[in-house]
């Protein structure tokens, strides 16, 4: 999920007469690539022991600088009413575990403002997820628009902060977090109704029950079992039949078909071998 919009909506959002430059900044292949590589937009971020705290700004530094310069130049020229604001209606995070449910650990995920040195959760937009609760969906909704300014050496914007706690003995990846959002930029700003951070626990996917038809593995196993049963049945049955046959059945060998009414046919009907009291006789 990348930035979306048209030149018309960008013009309305920025109150600018021309938006070609802003559109290029936001939607160029380079800008979209930076959103993915620097901000993990729509990508899976692995939480490891050597990366126990992750801070992901929602706008890359280079893109932030170019957008801020665009609004500042318009503001200085008297064409725009401000130096620009960043608006994010919602941030959605999909969280899944990559270890057993027995692992003792948790994740603390929250929305922060890089203008705050302490990186405290803004508006209580913070959620704690225990390992055994996963998978889950988390949503954040900030109540204000963030000014596109530089504070000290930090480019001010919203950021997703993820903290890993516990997981003693697990040095590798214990959880995967995939975040999506859509940032908007305008020369106007507003305040919004406070909505608590959302946490929705999701039932794990039952991949066996969801199959409408037998899976390839199930079909293979069934076919293999059928083959084994069939071969065992044929061999066993043949052996049992051979042992169970009477002496008369063993001697009753089929002869080629003979025309009805012929002398051979009459002889065939007359002389039939039988066993009577252990003695072979012809009748």
Curated annotation (Swiss-Prot):
The keyword Transport applies. GO terms for biological process: transport of virus in host, cell to cell. It comes from the Viruses. It is found in: Host cell junction, Host plasmodesma. InterPro entries: MPV (IPR000603). Keywords: Host cell junction, Transport, Viral movement protein. Pfam families: 3A (PF00803). Transmembrane segments: none annotated. One of its GO terms (cellular component) is host cell plasmodesma. The keyword Protein transport does not apply. Disulfide bonds: none annotated. Transports viral genome to neighboring plant cells directly through plasmosdesmata, without any budding. The movement protein allows efficient cell to cell propagation, by bypassing the host cell wall barrier. Acts by forming a tubular structure at the host plasmodesmata, enlarging it enough to allow free passage of virion capsids. Belongs to the cucumovirus movement protein family. This is Movement protein. It comes from Cucumber mosaic virus (strain NT9) (CMV).
């Amino acid at each position: 999920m990348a930035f979306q919009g048209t030149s018309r909506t960008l013009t309305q959002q920025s109150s600018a007469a021309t938006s070609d430059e802003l559109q290029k900044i936001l939607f160029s292949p380079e800008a979209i690539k930076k959103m993915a590589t620097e901000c993990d937009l729509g990508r899976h971020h692995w939480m490891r022991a050597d990366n126990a705290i992750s801070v992901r700004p929602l706008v890359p530094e280079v893109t932030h600088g170019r957008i801020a310069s665009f609004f500042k130049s318009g503001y200085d020229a008297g064409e725009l009413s401000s130096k620009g604001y960043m608006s994010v209606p919602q941030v959605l995070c999909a969280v899944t575990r990559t270890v057993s449910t027995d692992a003792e650990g948790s994740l603390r995920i929250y929305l922060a403002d890089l203008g705050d040195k302490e990186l405290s959760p803004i508006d209580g937009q913070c959620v704690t997820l225990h390992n055994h609760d996963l998978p889950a969906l988390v949503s954040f909704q900030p109540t204000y628009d963030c000014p596109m300014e530089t504070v000290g050496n930090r480019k001010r914007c919203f950021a997703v902060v993820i903290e890993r706690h516990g997981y003693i003995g697990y040095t590798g990846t214990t959880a995967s977090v995939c975040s999506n959002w859509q940032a908007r930029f305008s020369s106007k700003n507003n305040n919004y109704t406070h909505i608590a951070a959302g946490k929705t626990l999701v039932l794990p996917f039952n991949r066996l029950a969801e199959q409408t038809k037998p899976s390839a593995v199930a079909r293979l196993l069934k076919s293999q079992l059928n083959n084994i049963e069939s071969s065992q049945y044929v061999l066993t049955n043949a052996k049992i039949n051979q042992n169970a046959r009477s002496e008369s059945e063993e001697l009753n060998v089929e002869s080629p078909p003979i025309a009805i009414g012929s002398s051979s046919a009459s002889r065939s009907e007359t002389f039939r071998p039988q066993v009577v009291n252990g003695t072979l006789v012809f009748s």
